[in-house]
């Protein structure tokens, strides 16, 4: 479930370099382990905003599953997320709930992150990321079959 949520958040962020190496484990005493926080997650929204990277050319590092693998960010569809969830062993109902919950929480997450940013943090970076997140989340909330 965490992996699915992460792929969804990578898509929301247009974090095109989100790949398996972003996932690490802490090895703890007595053969226990837990996931580390994600790291090296970079959004392409600032590059799209200044016209350096056309959305149609963006490919994600990890694909979604469908009849084939889907890497193109702008062509990822609701059904691809649902197929990926099914392949990971959980129901389309749960996947849909995760998508809706994540999208519904986007504004509050943006507010929290915005409050943590230093005042000198460049708006040319934060602005496009926040706007892009809101736009992608709205697509999920509206129930669009295609994005």
Descriptions of predicted regions:
Residues 1-20, 24-147:
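Anionic ligand-binding catalytic core segments
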């Amino acid at each position: 479930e965490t992996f699915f949520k992460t792929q969804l958040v990578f898509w929301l962020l247009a974090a095109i370099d989100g790949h398996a190496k972003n996932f690490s484990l802490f090895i703890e005493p007595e053969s226990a382990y837990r996931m580390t926080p994600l790291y090296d997650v970079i959004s392409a929204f600032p590059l799209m905003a200044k016209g350096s990277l056309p959305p149609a050319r963006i490919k994600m590092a990890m694909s979604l599953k469908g009849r084939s693998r889907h890497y193109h960010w702008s062509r990822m569809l609701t059904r691809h997320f649902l197929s990926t969830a099914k392949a990971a062993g959980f129901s389309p109902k749960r996947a849909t709930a995760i998508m809706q919950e994540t999208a519904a929480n986007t504004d509050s997450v943006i507010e929290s992150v915005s409050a943590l940013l230093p005042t000198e943090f460049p708006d040319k970076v934060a602005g496009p990321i926040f706007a892009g997140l809101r736009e992608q989340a709205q697509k999920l909330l509206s129930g669009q079959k295609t994005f």
